Amino acid sequence: MKTARRRAREFAVQGIYEWELNPDRPASLIEKHLRENEYFAKADEALFRSILYGVLKDVELLSAQVGRYYERAEDEVSPVERAVLLMAALELTQSPETPYPVIINEAIEITKTFGGTDGHKFVNGVLDKLAAEVRGDEVLAQKQRRKQD
């Protein structure tokens, strides 16, 4: 069963994807369209809104952050992968209360649901590098805990 937070992230990714394909469309219309889905009521609305509006507000900064770690040409990154990466970049940089492994795992699972065959591997690689940059202390602590186990 999907959690309310997973649903919120999935709807946010769909909204970011929709915006990527039609950047002149206002976020409020994208949100209205997504709310028509019968499962939207089961999503964490506050998280959905913070991700959708946060990504669209800071898209240039977030794009630059994830783009540094692409190991392929930017035009080879699918719109789904890009939407997931933008969502996760926002959470990694602006939601320190959410552990980075949770953010990366959610991004991988959403990419498996909506993306291409191996898109999740690309997303994982980019986000691992971004997490090391923006949450270095947390990543280091996690690695040290793993060594002790």
Curated annotation (Swiss-Prot):
Keyword check for Acyltransferase: no
GO function terms (MF aspect): RNA binding
This protein's UniProt keywords: RNA-binding, Transcription, Transcription antitermination, Transcription regulation
Any one GO CC term of the record: cytosol
Pfam families the record matches: NusB
UniProt-listed GO biological process terms: DNA-templated transcription termination; transcription antitermination
Xref: InterPro entries: NusB-like_sf, NusB_fam, NusB_RsmB_TIM44
Transmembrane segments: none
Alphabetized PANTHER family for the sequence: ANTITERMINATION NUSB DOMAIN-CONTAINING PROTEIN, N UTILIZATION SUBSTANCE PROTEIN B-RELATED
Biological role: Involved in transcription antitermination. Required for transcription of ribosomal RNA (rRNA) genes. Binds specifically to the boxA antiterminator sequence of the ribosomal RNA (rrn) operons.
UniProt similarity note: Belongs to the NusB family.
The protein, known as: Transcription antitermination protein NusB
Source organism of this protein record: Chromobacterium violaceum (strain ATCC 12472 / DSM 30191 / JCM 1249 / CCUG 213 / NBRC 12614 / NCIMB 9131 / NCTC 9757 / MK)
Gene: nusB
